[in-house]
Amino acid sequence: MRGGRGAPFWLWPLPKLALLPLLWVLFQRTRPQGSAGPLQCYGVGPLGDLNCSWEPLGDLGAPSELHLQSQKYRSNKTQTVAVAAGRSWVAIPREQLTMSDKLLVWGTKAGQPLWPPVFVNLETQMKPNAPRLGPDVDFSEDDPLEATVHWAPPTWPSHKVLICQFHYRRCQEAAWTLLEPELKTIPLTPVEIQDLELATGYKVYGRCRMEKEEDLWGEWSPILSFQTPPSAPKDVWVSGNLCGTPGGEEPLLLWKAPGPCVQVSYKVWFWVGGRELSPEGITCCCSLIPSGAEWARVSAVNATSWEPLTNLSLVCLDSASAPRSVAVSSIAGSTELLVTWQPGPGEPLEHVVDWARDGDPLEKLNWVRLPPGNLSALLPGNFTVGVPYRITVTAVSASGLASASSVWGFREELAPLVGPTLWRLQDAPPGTPAIAWGEVPRHQLRGHLTHYTLCAQSGTSPSVCMNVSGNTQSVTLPDLPWGPCELWVTASTIAGQGPPGPILRLHLPDNTLRWKVLPGILFLWGLFLLGCGLSLATSGRCYHLRHKVLPRWVWEKVPDPANSSSGQPHMEQVPEAQPLGDLPILEVEEMEPPPVMESSQPAQATAPLDSGYEKHFLPTPEELGLLGPPRPQVLA
């Protein structure tokens, strides 16, 4: 049909016998030997099976049958191999093939070819097995370090040459390095790896191919791991209070581990008091420093002969030769810290900057070494915001160490998490409360302290606050009002003010002047009244009044209420009569006594009744001396 689109030639139904002439036509369109395409076939080893694999071709999918036609021995014989559904490869047993044969291979689905056939030469188109590496590895005895890896080629006819290539990499590195040149199996030479580092782990593996098949490489060999000879640590440093005040944590001698892929044993020597000490059981990578040690030396067990020992002087130099003006700052958009300082008066060999997170053990110390001309260091690492890091700069010279005072650095300061704890001190002066507070833990302060804020609240009145210097931790409060009072303190950094600490509750007495003077006035007034009373009681003018006002047992010389004479008949003393004079005569009529009524019963004698009450009366005129002596009576 004119203008119609013709179907592909392999979709037309053809009888089986008609396929043979067509394949000879398609042979002109076969892919070159070894070229990549939908179908690839190769032999595995000199006596292995023939492996064929393919990729699905669009909507046509995978073949259901694979056809192999001999082109060298029986050109008219075609061998068909069934393919399981869903598989993308098939293995043809070696027993079904002829040695050194040349095959034409294609795949069909429902009797229709899916792709052009490929040409396979069984004599050359083979993948060798993987080579065998090690386990012996030899190392050179001088610098630079070289390693010689022994290996064996895969099983192969002795007259046929294989080309093998090897790759190596350092432990924990991602990229592999190709060793040049490629090696041949005839003659067989070992694998040599140059410019290696001591106390380092390496990995190596390889693969082989036939000499004429440049792109048909065999399988990779298993990876061989090996370790170069151990060496003394290059970087040794001190952690802890080596040159500070004795009594703290014991300092440690630290060195950096060679890496997780290497196992090294170490030996340490210290020079103490003119003799050498070598502690046993040294683990990686620290050792306690004995008191008074002057220098330390570290070496690795079974180290190479040309590797020198690592020495470090432990003598503490005067602080005047230490670096000065150490400052720490953060870098915007970076997780690193910048440390700067000014040099001391000496000429150091190098500067060492070490740092550790607050609260970390001595073993977790980091440090970097810098040339003597460097006066700044960019500390690597992922520093956390709000976390304090102790940073120390030390000048290292041949005579010893001179360390500057440690400083605390922050990548970014934050507001404190807690407030200080308050407690009351002894009043100074009495009546004036004094308080003190503790420091906020550094990891909760989260920055450099700028000041404290002290707040007080009495009753329902609003709180009153005042700022206190960060160097002050105790104050007296003379102006607090009397009554109940609450106190609290907050800490502040440049990032802001933190929450208040625990509240201290006080109850203050009234300390105003009137309440201080009134008790004194009352006391003096009481003394005045008491003095007046005593003076009146003891003076002659009022002496006789005590008999009338006070009980007898009070004014008796020896007061004794139990033995008082108040219960006995009282005999009044009458003053003597005055001499007779011209006094008026008073006529007195004598009255007869009333008659006595006799009772039938005799009168009973009654004892005087003592009720305990003493009768006292006002003095009579005679007692007061207001009247003259009585006149004699004149009887009418």
Swiss-Prot record:
Residue ranges occupied by any Fibronectin type-III domain in the UniProt entry: 131-231, 322-417, 419-511
Q: Where is this motif: WSXWS motif?
A: 217-221
Which family does the record assign?
Answer: Belongs to the type I cytokine receptor family. Type 2 subfamily.
The residue ranges crossing the membrane are 517-537
Please describe the organ and tissue distribution of this protein's expression.
Highly expressed in lymphoid tissues such as spleen, lymph nodes and peripheral blood leukocytes. Weakly expressed in other tissues examined including heart, brain, fetal and adult lung, liver, skeletal muscle, kidney, pancreas, prostate, testis, ovary, small intestine, kidney and colon. In the lymphoid system, higher level expression in CD4+ T-cell subsets than in CD8+ T-cell subsets. Also weaker expression in CD19+ B-cells and monocytes.
What compartments host this protein?
Answer: Membrane
User: Which of the residues are on side Extracellular?
Assistant: 33-516
Q: Motif Box 1 motif: which ranges?
A: 554-562
State which residues carry a glycan (glycosylated): N51, N76, N302, N311, N374, N382, N467
Q: Provide this UniProt record's keywords sorted from A to Z.
A: Glycoprotein, Membrane, Receptor, Repeat, Signal, Transmembrane, Transmembrane helix
Q: What does the entry's free-text domain comment contain?
A: The WSXWS motif appears to be necessary for proper protein folding and thereby efficient intracellular transport and cell-surface receptor binding. The box 1 motif is required for JAK interaction and/or activation.
Question: Under the cellular component aspect of Gene Ontology, which terms does the record hold?
Answer: plasma membrane
Q: Which BP terms from GO are recorded?
A: cell surface receptor signaling pathway; defense response to Gram-positive bacterium; immune response; negative regulation of interleukin-17 production; negative regulation of interleukin-6 production; negative regulation of neuron apoptotic process; negative regulation of T cell extravasation; negative regulation of T-helper 17 type immune response
What is the designated name of this protein? Interleukin-27 receptor subunit alpha
Q: Which PROSITE patterns match?
A: FN3
What is the species of this protein?
Homo sapiens (Human)
Q: Which gene encodes it?
A: IL27RA
Chief location: membrane
Q: What does this protein do?
A: Receptor for IL27. Requires IL6ST/GP130 to mediate signal transduction in response to IL27. This signaling system acts through STAT3 and STAT1. Acts as a receptor for the neuroprotective peptide humanin as part of a complex with IL6ST/GP130 and CNTFR. Involved in the regulation of Th1-type immune responses. Also appears to be involved in innate defense mechanisms.
- List the molecular function annotations (GO) for this entry: interleukin-27 receptor activity; transmembrane signaling receptor activity
Query: What residue stretch is flagged as signal peptide?
Result: 1-32
